[in-house]
């Protein structure tokens, strides 16, 4: 017999919404919800407005697929960036880590994911054809594969590396200074800068 206190529908909806965040289970989501409603109503309102604003105002960059307010993001629109270098990453968070290392002045393409066949994520879901078309724009001379050093990231890098090499492009991979099994988002900027400088051909 379930003696748990019945929760109002709006509270249940908030908890379920918070559970969508990575690494957040039912218990953590419930704690977050109660904290916001009990101790930080202003913060809850700010969070709601910020989320709504982001969903409404952000779009995908027409060039690199990252988030932007305009058709083309500030990096792609910067004429001082090296258009001969294209760095492929899994997420905007990975892009941000590489950018903060100050060791890269080229352009990016953000996959917004990685190959994960067991989860139903294949080349079509990641629109690999768009990636290949972007790399074959006539300006790109080297493609740096900066996917994570996880099983899925390595599979993604291998698949893309072969397809790009078939098109005559130079393809390199971050050096192994980045620990195996790690995600770029959690690697320090110095290690990322070294891995970029010491990148190797695939």
UniProtKB/Swiss-Prot annotation:
Write the gene name: recR
SMART domains in the cross-refs: TOPRIM
* Biological-process GO terms, alphabetical: DNA recombination; DNA repair
> What biological function has been recorded for the protein in this entry?
May play a role in DNA repair. It seems to be involved in an RecBC-independent recombinational process of DNA repair. It may act with RecF and RecO.
Toprim domain ranges (all copies): 84-179
Which PROSITE patterns does its entry note? RECR (PS01300), TOPRIM (PS50880)
Q: Show the CDD domains listed in the entry.
A: TOPRIM_recR (cd01025)
Please name the Pfam families in this protein's record: RecR_C, RecR_HhH, RecR_ZnF, Toprim_4
Q: What is this protein called?
A: Recombination protein RecR
Zinc-finger (C4-type) residue ranges come to 61-76
* Molecular function via GO: DNA binding; zinc ion binding
The family note in this entry says: Belongs to the RecR family.
- InterPro entries for the chain: DNA_Rcmb_RecR, Rcmb_RecR, Rcmb_RecR_Znf, TOPRIM_dom, TOPRIM_RecR
Q: Which UniProt keywords apply?
A: DNA damage, DNA recombination, DNA repair, Metal-binding, Zinc, Zinc-finger
């Amino acid at each position: 017999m379930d003696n748990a206190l019945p929760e109002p529908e709006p509270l249940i909806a908030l908890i379920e919404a918070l559970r969508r965040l990575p690494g957040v289970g039912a218990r953590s989501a419930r704690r977050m919800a109660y904290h916001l409603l009990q101790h930080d109503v202003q913060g809850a309102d700010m969070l709601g407005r910020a989320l709504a604003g982001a969903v409404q105002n952000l779009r995908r960059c027409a060039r690199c697929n990252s988030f932007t307010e305009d058709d083309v993001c500030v990096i792609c629109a910067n004429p001082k960036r090296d258009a001969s270098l294209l760095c492929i990453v899994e997420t905007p968070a990975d892009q941000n880590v590489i950018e903060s290392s100050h060791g890269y002045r080229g352009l990016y393409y953000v996959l917004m994911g990685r190959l994960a066949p067991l989860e139903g994520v294949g080349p079509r879901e990641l629109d690999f054809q768009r990636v290949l078309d972007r790399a074959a724009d006539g300006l790109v001379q080297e493609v740096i594969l900066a996917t994570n050093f996880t099983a899925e990231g390595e599979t993604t890098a291998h698949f893309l590396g072969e397809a790009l090499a078939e098109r005559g492009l130079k393809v390199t991979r971050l050096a192994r200074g980045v620990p195996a099994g790690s995600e770029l988002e959690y690697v320090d900027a110095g290690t990322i800068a070294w891995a970029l400088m010491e990148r190797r051909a695939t």
